[in-house]
Amino acid sequence: MILFPAIDLKNGQCVRLEQGDMARATVFNLDPAAQAKSFADQGFEYLHVVDLDGAFAGKPMNAQAVEAMLKIVKMPVQLGGGIRDLKTVEAWLGKGITRVIIGTAAVRDPELVKMAAKAFPGRVAVGLDARDGKVAVEGWAETSEVTALDIAKRFEDAGVAAIIFTDIARDGLLKGLNLDATIALGDAISIPVIASGGLASIEDVKAMLTPRARKLEGAIAGRALYDGRLDPAEALALIRAISG
């Protein structure tokens, strides 16, 4: 299991939102690169970054902050937000991003995902953010009529590296992961699934390490790390002890 620390970027700063609402943003660090280094120093091995402004604009908006992080940390970085065409995918991978996350475009333009996954094997993930079971797009500003499972199944044979499944209702609220829905998705498809939204404490990490969650690739931790509710050393030691 991989525990991904999250850095969400808004106006070049490291923030956390509540339920994806840009008006409910809390700034946690003015220097995202310093935050990335802190996570690396704490022992994390894979960083999760989202360009929030990019998700709304439909194009990269925090490139300077992302590039500054890439210069400082050597661990793999997966990036989402504003990645809507093959040119942007290629540009980010060329700059050192390990894995890009395609969200809105996976709903609007599934062929883009298939082309990108074929062109860059193992380096394209799909972000599915659900509200009441239906996938939200455009930075969560709009809700579609399709379910996460419907979309995930489109990419079963496309070579997608992972599905990142976020429960919007829990995101940033420390209510605990929606493991039931995440595990159900993971059990229904062959693509590895990453849990996101609501991770609140070491209890969520323990739940991720139980046999029923064995198919999940990992979980994303955000506010719990920034608020000090989740101790990085304790969480990483537990993961190493149980999953190796």
Curated annotation (Swiss-Prot):
The gene is hisA. Pathway: Amino-acid biosynthesis; L-histidine biosynthesis; L-histidine from 5-phospho-alpha-D-ribose 1-diphosphate: step 4/9. It comes from Bradyrhizobium sp. (strain ORS 278). The active site is at D8, D129. This is 1-(5-phosphoribosyl)-5-[(5-phosphoribosylamino)methylideneamino] imidazole-4-carboxamide isomerase. Its EC number is 5.3.1.16. CDD domains: HisA. Gene3D superfamilies: Aldolase class I. It is an enzyme of class 5 (isomerase). Its main location: cytoplasm. It catalyses: 1-(5-phospho-beta-D-ribosyl)-5-[(5-phospho-beta-D-ribosylamino)methylideneamino]imidazole-4-carboxamide = 5-[(5-phospho-1-deoxy-D-ribulos-1-ylimino)methylamino]-1-(5-phospho-beta-D-ribosyl)imidazole-4-carboxamide. One of its GO terms (cellular component) is cytoplasm. The keyword ATP-binding does not apply. Keywords: Amino-acid biosynthesis, Cytoplasm, Histidine biosynthesis, Isomerase.
